[in-house]
């Protein structure tokens, strides 16, 4: 830590979202930090001049990037050419990422003070902004479709052009979700795209449902479902169909539609499932987030 306080140094402790300066195994520190920030260990790049430490982390955390940095004179060159920190697009949410990670650490600390999880959620004083797609957020929405893997039921990816086409089409019910709480703004964290059936006007098929890992377990998915059903009712939709396509990373949402009250109507040999929800009689499920709807009449 002393090195970060050197008067001629460029970095300060506040430049880091988390600092682990202890004698614990480094793979354990990576796992602990990932849990604190609510991200995957696959999001980390581990840089160490000790080959033994690099081998341990590589063996314990297969998804963590561990570059072979070699000689001291090669450090900057290896990291610069690795591509780990390249980005094709930079959204407004990206610029706030460090602040968002710090806020997540504060939430984790606050949660430890509650025995009842529902009470903890209420204490966050959450407000969601949910509405139709806006040009202001299209870049972030497209980015999410190509990054989110855990809470992503179909893992369908979209290019900017494809998302623009969805935005300009009347065939779709489109929802983005932003989540705020007393610790800060989480940004755009949820996306749902449902396509109406040209032959059966009472049917809506969910083509995409995803949520950023930074807001998992905060009931944002319930708020999104309530808003989706509300918009479906306005369109005269009677049935909403959802699909789950399993991948190595999205097992956490395998039972999502069932938990929402959807009826399973099919399953193939690969585990792909289809689900149906009758809109009539649906009761709102969100009880902890105040929702402010935007851009919908």
Which functions belong to the PLM regions below?
Residues 39-41, 171-172, 234-237:
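Short, high-confidence coil segments that cap the C-terminus of an alpha-helix
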Residues 129-214:
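A conserved beta-strand-loop-helix scaffold within acyl/acetyltransferase catalytic domains
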Residues 1, 30, 46, 53-54, ...:
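Extended, hydrophobic alpha-helical segments in both membrane/secreted and soluble proteins
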Residues 1-21:
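Substrate-recognition/cap helix-loop segment adjacent to the acidic, metal-dependent catalytic center
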Residues 216-230:
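Conserved acetyl-CoA-binding loop-helix of GNAT-fold acetyltransferases
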């Amino acid at each position: 830590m002393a090195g970060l306080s050197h008067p001629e140094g460029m970095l300060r402790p506040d430049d880091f979202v988390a600092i682990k300066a202890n004698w614990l195994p480094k793979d354990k520190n990576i796992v602990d930090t990932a849990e604190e920030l609510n991200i995957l260990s696959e999001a980390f790049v581990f840089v160490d001049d000790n080959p033994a430490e690099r081998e341990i982390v590589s063996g314990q955390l297969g998804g963590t990037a561990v570059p072979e940095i070699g000689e001291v004179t090669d450090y900057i060159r290896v990291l610069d050419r690795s591509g780990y920190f390249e980005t094709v697009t930079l959204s407004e949410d990206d610029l706030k990422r460090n602040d968002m990670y710090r806020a997540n650490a504060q939430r984790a600390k606050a949660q430890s003070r509650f025995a009842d999880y529902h009470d903890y959620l209420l204490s966050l004083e959450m407000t969601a902004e949910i509405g139709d797609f806006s040009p202001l957020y299209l870049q972030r929405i497209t980015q999410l479709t190509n990054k989110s893997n855990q809470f992503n039921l179909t893992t369908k990816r979209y290019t900017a052009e494809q998302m623009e086409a969805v935005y300009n089409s009347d065939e779709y019910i489109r929802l983005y979700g932003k989540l705020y709480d007393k610790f800060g703004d989480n940004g755009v964290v949820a996306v749902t795209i449902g396509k109406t059936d040209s032959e059966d006007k009472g049917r809506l098929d969910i083509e995409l449902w995803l949520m950023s890992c930074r807001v998992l377990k905060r009931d944002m998915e319930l708020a999104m479902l309530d808003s989706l059903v509300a918009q479906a009712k306005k369109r005269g939709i009677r049935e909403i169909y959802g699909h789950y396509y399993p991948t190595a990373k999205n097992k956490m949402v395998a039972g999502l539609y069932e938990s929402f009250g959807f009826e399973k109507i099919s399953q193939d040999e690969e585990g792909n499932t289809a689900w149906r929800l009758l809109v009539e009689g649906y009761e709102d499920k969100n009880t902890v987030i105040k929702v402010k709807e935007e851009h919908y009449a």
